[in-house]
């Protein structure tokens, strides 16, 4: 407890975990590993996904066009049936992200990409300086956020080492996470050519460690604890009063921003909760899934007739 403050213990009949994919996984792995919640499914951390993403950017030489002005994402397109690309802008002053950029390289092998990096650097040493120049970076840069709806995933598990307890991830050998998406590099090069800028990748490219803005999964729905972490009503298997309601319950690479899917799943899960004092319409765990109609609240937060009124059908 920080600053010597007294520890407080809170009790609740129902507990919702909604800390975001990474932190929810971290908390639950801690609880399982320390035997506080030992019956959490062994599948915890499996089917974690990165939305099969690539982050590339085109950096212009000046701020004749201020790319920081406007909505963060204004459009998108699909270069093929599985790939979705969005031009993204950062607000003025958001320049720290630029330090993760580096000289753009191509290839499915990290060794090959490192060779390309050195070759490009020796051919034009000033290229690295221009890539790492983060002055007014957000005003000079267009990010190409690339996402794919392919079936790739990683497993996130706890590990103890000299550095203590931490989480580590491994690629699935049969469904490996994408480390190189050619369309992403092609698009950002075209943006750079159009505006006289420099295309850039990120430092993870050099070690086959893709970055993602949308880490999801790891606490997925299953028919039992042998196939998933939660049931179809978002109750943790073997702990039916513990609920997970965030991005960690997403079960696939969506290929788009997952925020609306996370919201839809959360709304569905909580719409099936009973009103206080009423009988729970959800079946007891292990009795199988059944379709349930949403439960109308007795005392809705938004009054009847007001804008944003909840309608249950």
What are these regions (language model features)?
Residues 1-77, 246, 259-287:
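Glycine-rich loop(s) and the adjacent beta-strand/alpha-helix scaffold that form part
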Residues 4-6, 44, 130-134, 142-143, ...:
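Generic recognition of flexible, low-complexity loop/linker segments
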Residues 7, 12, 70-72, 139-143, ...:
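Active-site lining segments that contact anionic ligands and/or coordinate catalytic metals
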Residues 17-18, 132, 174-178, 256:
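Hydrophobic alpha-helical scaffolding
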Residues 25-27, 67, 155-156, 229-231, ...:
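Short helix/loop capping segments that flank catalytic or ligand/cofactor-binding pockets
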Residues 41-166, 215, 237, 247, ...:
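FAD cofactor-binding and catalytic pocket of flavoenzymes
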Residues 145, 168-252, 259:
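A glycine-rich dinucleotide-binding beta-alpha-beta segment and adjacent secondary-structure elements
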Residues 198-206, 279-288:
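Short, glycine/acidic-rich hinge or "gate" loops at secondary-structure transitions
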């Amino acid at each position: 407890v920080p600053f010597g403050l007294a520890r407080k213990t809170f009790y609740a009949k129902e507990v919702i975990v909604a800390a975001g994919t990474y932190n929810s996984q971290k908390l639950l792995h801690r609880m399982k590993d320390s035997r506080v919640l030992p019956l959490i499914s062994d599948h915890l951390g499996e089917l974690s996904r990165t939305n099969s993403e690539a982050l590339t950017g085109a950096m212009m030489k000046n701020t004749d066009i201020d790319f920081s002005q406007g909505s963060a994402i204004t459009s998108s397109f699909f270069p093929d049936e599985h790939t979705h690309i969005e031009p993204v802008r950062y607000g003025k002053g958001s320049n720290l992200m630029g330090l993760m950029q580096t000289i753009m390289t191509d290839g499915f092998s990290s060794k090959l990409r490192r060779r390309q990096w050195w070759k490009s650097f020796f051919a034009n040493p000033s290229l690295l300086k221009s890539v790492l120049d983060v002055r007014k970076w957000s005003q000079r840069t267009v990010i190409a956020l690339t996402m794919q709806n392919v079936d790739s995933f990683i497993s996130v598990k706890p590990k103890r080492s000299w550095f203590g307890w931490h989480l580590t991830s491994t690629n699935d050998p049969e469904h490996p996470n994408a480390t190189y998406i050619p369309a992403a590099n092609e698009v950002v090069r075209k943006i750079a050519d159009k505006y006289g800028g420099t295309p850039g990748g990120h430092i993870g490219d050099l070690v086959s460690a893709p970055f993602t803005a949308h880490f999801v999964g790891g606490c997925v729905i299953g028919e039992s604890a042998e196939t998933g972490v939660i049931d179809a009503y978002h109750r943790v298997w073997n702990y039916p009063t513990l609920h997970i309601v965030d991005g960690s319950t997403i079960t696939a690479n969506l290929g788009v921003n997952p925020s609306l899917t996370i919201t839809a799943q959360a709304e569905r899960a909580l719409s099936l909760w009973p009103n206080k004092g009423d009988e729970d319409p959800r079946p007891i765990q292990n009795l199988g899934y059944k379709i349930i109609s949403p439960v109308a609240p007795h005392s809705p937060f938004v009054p009847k007739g007001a804008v944003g009124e909840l309608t249950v059908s």
